């Protein structure tokens, strides 16, 4: 029933507000966890089919996403922690489930020139800048609001990135919306405006394992990427500027292919990963969300399909997971036990004029949509 509010007391929360509408529920919680003295909010979206997403105000992190297999058995398919404090531990985890900004992916040597001025950013992935810097959007507190709409139940994350934050020019107003629908869609909407020209490239850094987090590696997952070309990288994982054909290479995922089938081939680009950590140039015809990728776990039948308005997709095969982190299952996250599919503009675009521009101008808005659809068969 639209607009029905329920107040509940819980052991892990100071307050819970739940809204129920059209078979969907959205629950916002103030947890007992704090970051730098500030409480962490948590939101849960659930659809009529039982799919359930949980996210927190720190980094907009998706901490849990439970989807069914072909037999109707649910599993949490995203890597993460039970204890929220682990998300802001020192050293920090590798961007599990977080909103990435102001610029997702790498900027060469932490520098770019805009309007005749050179801006210097943190080289937090030496010698380059990665995912917005030392304290990017993944390490910031966001304000969460909730709403019901014709599309579904939504959690809306907002924050103001001040002028000069992590070296970027301009005050950026940012809104990221997670919407769960009864069609088993997770819709990711990104919106931003600025008062000065600035690079913007927002994405989401969930690590997927469709067999269930903690279940082992993802090498048997079958991946399809709708791309005829990719952007080769140098030894520091910065694009060379070339748009190379995937034909005859381990980067050809135009047909469903097991991730492990070619990942260790004697290929110069794979050695630089080591493994997959590259941007694919998506085949696009229009301006709306178009098919980008499909990921399937043959054993469980769980499948996700991605459509996006973005021109690129970064496929990262979890090469640097090393077993040092223990996940929700109580099992260590070893190498390649999760993978990322990050919809995006291309890496290092501010320094590569032949790539689609990522410069947002005052008076314009940054708007991007990615739709992740879950199924099992």
Please give the residue ranges for each predicted region.
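Bacterial N-terminal signal peptides
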Residues: 11-21
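An exposed, glycine/acidic-rich loop-and-rim segment of catalytic or binding clefts
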Residues: 24-377
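Bacterial N-terminal signal peptides that target proteins for export
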Residues: 1-12
């Amino acid at each position: 029933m639209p607009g029905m509010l329920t107040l509940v007391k819980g052991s892990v929360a100071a307050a819970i507000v739940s809204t129920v509408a059209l078979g969907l529920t959205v629950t916002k919680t103030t947890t007992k966890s704090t970051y730098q003295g500030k409480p962490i909010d948590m939101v849960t979206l659930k659809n009529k089919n039982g799919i359930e997403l949980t996210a927190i105000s720190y980094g907009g992190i998706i901490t849990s996403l439970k989807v069914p297999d072909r037999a109707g058995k649910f599993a949490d398919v995203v890597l993460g922690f039970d204890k929220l404090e682990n998300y802001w531990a020192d050293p920090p985890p590798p961007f599990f489930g977080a909103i990435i900004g102001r610029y997702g992916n790498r900027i060469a040597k932490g520098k770019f020139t805009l309007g005749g001025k050179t801006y210097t950013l943190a080289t937090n992935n030496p010698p380059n800048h990665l995912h917005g810097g030392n304290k990017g959007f993944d390490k910031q507190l966001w304000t969460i609001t909730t709403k019901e709409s014709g599309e579904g139940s939504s959690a809306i994350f907002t924050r103001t990135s001040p002028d000069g934050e992590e070296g970027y020019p301009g005050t950026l107003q940012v809104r990221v919306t997670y919407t769960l629908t009864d069609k088993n869609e997770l819709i990711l909407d990104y919106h931003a405006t600025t008062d000065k020209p600035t690079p913007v490239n927002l994405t989401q850094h969930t690590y997927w394992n469709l067999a269930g987090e903690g279940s082992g590696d993802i090498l048997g997952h079958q991946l399809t990427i709708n791309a005829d070309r990719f952007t080769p990288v140098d030894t520091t994982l910065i694009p060379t500027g070339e748009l190379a054909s995937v034909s005859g290479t381990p980067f050809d995922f135009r047909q469903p292919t097991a991730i492990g089938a070619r990942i260790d081939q004697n290929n110069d680009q794979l050695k630089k990963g080591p493994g997959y950590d590259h941007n694919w140039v998506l085949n696009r015809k229009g301006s709306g969300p178009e098919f980008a990728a499909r990921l399937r776990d043959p054993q469980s039948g769980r499948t996700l399909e991605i459509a996006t308005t973005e021109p690129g997709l970064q496929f990262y095969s979890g090469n640097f997971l090393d077993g040092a982190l223990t996940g929700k299952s109580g099992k260590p996250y070893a190498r390649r036990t999760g993978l990322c599919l990050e919809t995006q503009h291309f890496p290092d675009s501010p320094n590569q004029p032949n790539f689609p521009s990522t410069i947002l101008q005052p008076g314009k808005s940054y708007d991007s949509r990615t739709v992740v659809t879950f199924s099992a068969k």
